[in-house]
Amino acid sequence: YNINVIVMVCREIELGKKKCERYWADRGDSKRFGDITVTLSKKEDLKDGYCLRTIKAEKGNEIRYIKQFHYTSWPDHGVPKTCLEILSLINHVRDVQSYSEDETTPLCV
């Protein structure tokens, strides 16, 4: 699949427990996963409780750019007090997906 949008709705650590593996690099760094190199091209902290990362993934001569939406305001325990931030995130994701060259490309959540 040629995934170009990833949506992540959990934090890396919640209630002191690791919830996901960090598969992106910090700005200025790269990470290797086998023969794939991942670099953070851009990070935008947005006002609606999430950030948008542009991740560059390289394997040999192939380069892909992936947009990762990371909702960082989900509380450690429970649910958000309002759905407005989630709705803003969904609208932004749909907006970015509408610019995709292949409309059949799945969304990775």
Swiss-Prot record:
Keywords associated with the record: Hydrolase, Protein phosphatase
**What PANTHER family does its record include?**
PROTEIN-TYROSINE-PHOSPHATASE (PTHR45983:SF2), TYROSINE PHOSPHATSE N18, PUTATIVE-RELATED (PTHR45983)
Quote the protein name from its UniProt record.
Answer: Tyrosine-protein phosphatase 6
The record's listing under InterPro entries reads: Prot-tyrosine_phosphatase-like, PTN12/18/22, PTP_cat
- Record's superkingdom? Eukaryota
Tell me the Pfam families matching this sequence: Y_phosphatase
- GO MF term set: non-membrane spanning protein tyrosine phosphatase activity
Q: What else is known?
A: STY 3 and STY 6 may represent a double domain transmembrane protein tyrosine phosphatase.
Where the record annotates domain Tyrosine-protein phosphatase, the positions are 1-109
Disulfide linkage: none
- Cellular-component GO terms for this entry: cytoplasm; nucleus
Per the record, the similarity remark reads:
Belongs to the protein-tyrosine phosphatase family.
Residues involved in substrate binding: 76
**What Enzyme Commission number(s) appear in the record?**
3.1.3.48
Task: Check the record and name the SUPFAM superfamilies matching this protein.
Answer: (Phosphotyrosine protein) phosphatases II
The gene behind this protein is STY-6
Lineage, uppermost ranks:
Eukaryota, Metazoa, Chordata, Tunicata, Ascidiacea
- What is catalyzed by this enzyme? O-phospho-L-tyrosyl-[protein] + H2O = L-tyrosyl-[protein] + phosphate
